[in-house]
Each structure stands twice: as C-alpha cells, then as structure tokens.
Amino acid sequence: VRPIDARLTAFAPGRTQRGFSKITLRRLLCACVAVLWCVAFAVGQTAPAPGSPAADARFTEVPGTVIDHSPAASGVYIGSPALAVLPNGEYIASHDFFGPGSEKNRTDLFSSQDKGRTWRRIATVIGQWWSSLFFHRNALYLMGTSRENGFAVIRKSTDGGRTWTEPKDETSGLLFGDGRYHCAPVPVVLHRGRLWRAMEDAMGPDGWGRHFNSFMMSADENADLLRAANWRSSNRLAGNPNWLDGGFGGWLEGNAVVAPDGTVVNMLRVDTPSCPEKVAMVRTSRDGREAGFDPATGFIDFPGGAKKFTIRFDPESRQYWCVASIVAEPYKSKGKPAGIRNTLALTCSPDLQRWVVRRVLLEHPDTLKHGFQYVDWIFDGRDIIAVCRTAYDDGLGGAHNYHDANFLTFHRFEDFR
C-alpha cells in the first residue's frame, strides 16, 4: 500500500490590521487579500490562502493529505482523530486539541466532498473532547467527554456536522455528570438491536493508567441517544498492578467488538514496560449489564497494543482488521512500547486471538519527533480510509515530540485485503 500524496487546503484568512494610517501600501494590499480569503472561506471555498500553513510548500513531504496543522511553538497539539462517512458520500473528520496552550475542551470538524482530496473546517465545538464520530438514523453524533477527564456527553447534528446540540442535562446529552471520565475515538457498534461503545472512568487511585476503570455502554438502536436514561452501563472494572508479573500499567481506550461467538467484548489498550505488546479482552454479558475479566486468559499478544487502536470486522474477508502503531523490530530497544509510534501497520486476525502484521503503511526512522498514531479508519469498498494524529516535519521546527502531534492527516490505503 502506498500513502497518497499530500493535497493541502487552507482554512484561515490573514489577521486584521490596526493603525491603517501608518501602514504601507504593501500591508494594505495584504490586508485586502486577507479579507478576500475570509469571504472565500465563508462561502465554502477550499483554495489555499496565501501565507496559510496548509498552503506551505514545506508540507509536501508530509504523508497523506493535510487536514489541519498546529505548530509546536503554539503549545497546542492535535489529538483524537475521528472519521465518519455520510450517506451522501461526504467525509467528516474531527480532532481535538491538547497541550499547555489549549483549554482541553475543543473539537474541530472538517468536511471533504471529493473523497478526501480537499478539506474545509465546518465547525468548532466547545465542551467536547476525546470523541467518536458516528452516523445513526439520519443523524451524526459526537460521543466523548466534555473536557479532559470531564463528564460523559453526546451531541447530535442533523446538518452534517455544521451545528450541534448542547448537552445541558440528562435529557439533552449529559450521560454522566458525576465524576471524571476518559475515552478516545473508538468504534460505536450496532449489534442485536443495540449500539455499543466502550468507556472508562478516571476515578481510581494511583494516577494515570492505573486509575482507569473500564466499562461498556449500550443503548437500544431506536432510543433517543441524547437521553441518559436510555443508556445502559456494565459494572466498572479496575485493573490490578500485579497482573503481567507486575508489568500492568493500566488499561484504556477500549474497542467494542463483536466476537466470533456473537458476544460483545471490550478490547483494551494495555500499558506495559516492554514487548510483546498486549491487549486485554473484557467479556460483556449479552444484555450489557455485566463485564468480567480473567487475567489468566484475557491478555492477548497484539502488535500496537500499547497505543490507541481501532478494530473493525470485515464481512467479506471474515477477518478482524486493525490499523495500529506497532513497534517494529529495529526499535524494540528504544524504550517503552507506548513511546514508539513511528511505524503504522495494518494487522488482522480471524478470531481476535491470533494477530499478524499484514503490511507497514507508514514509517519514519526517527522515533523522537515523528509519530503516526491514534488512527481512526473506515472500510471504503476495496480501500481503507483513515485519519491520523501525525507528528512530522513542517519547516517550523517540526513536532514538539512524537506524541505532541502537529498535523491531522487523511490517508487512503488501497486494496487492503
């Protein structure tokens, strides 16, 4: 599979000017150009704006199509990519912002009407973070938290992501307002008349990783998804630091997946000090009320298991597929698996137990300031389409590090089967 070439689209116009009586003619002309590009953006044009980051020739080496860019110097980094396809064929992508310069409560949304070749920003949502995008019953939904470790919330859009409902109370999208919650853009799965989505709270002891308690949420497919009473939750499971011979550092960012036996399982990222990477398979009862984990059998070797991943089942190949940030052999001595994100690979399994790497999709030899991570993806016929939190060179000093990404990129991986 070859990464597609970057095609860059601008979103932001230039800044307004002050002190017009003192500015030079050149500055006045630049200001006029900026206003014209404001108008172009307002009417939905996608041509690159002069001087905008997306129009910068220095981005042509970035793999894929650049959707958004935030320079490291801003202290605002790009996180939580999510992707959905509307019935009319329009692609919708989203991401949030983290880092010392961010409020850790904002999600931006983008639209592509040409199969991912060009993108434009269509909305900014304040009070939404770590969110999945999914389309259900003629509406688009954002489901995640209100901010970093905030309340669990869901929003609805009936105009393709341009405007969104506000989760003000338990009837309008506030699902849990009683504590600290955590998740990522993970799959929302329809199975046996219910929608399923994994979640964690962050209310356990001992800090990051070990404070996550995993659980499964589900709702009737015909229910009003904005009403908290329509969502059912399993019991919440805490991890145990003694698991994996004392190497268990926590579980998080679980995927709801329909197992071969027809039950829904929660496949969770596991923080470990060394390879092989692992996932934890938590079993869920058919009614979604009970979750259970057996540490003797529930840990599975899984390439990329120490970072966020997305698993989806393909009926045509009868395989489970995953796009994950694996630790390739040359990099296994570079540090903890969670800190190695320079290789993106396609993996698959017939049964959720035996996973193999099918091909490397993206790779860079540097592990310190380059990363391909947190990929959300969808089957698109013979291809996989994906959005990626990408740390890469930008001509401005590059990413702060492999983790603190400066790009959101779109990719099409052809003929994945």
Model-flagged regions — what are they?
Residues K307-K308:
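Alpha-helical scaffolding within the catalytic cores
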Residues I311:
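Catalytic cores of secreted/periplasmic lytic hydrolases that degrade extracellular macromolecules
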Residues L29-A40:
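Bacterial N-terminal signal peptides
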Residues Q45-S80, A84-W130, F134-A184, V188-G249, ...:
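Beta-rich carbohydrate-recognition and catalytic domains
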Residues V1-R26:
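N-terminal secretory signal peptides that target proteins for export/translocation
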Residues F372-V375:
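Short glycine-rich, acidic/polar surface loops and turns
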Residues I378:
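Short alpha-helix at the nucleotide-sugar/activated-sugar donor binding site of glycosyltransferases
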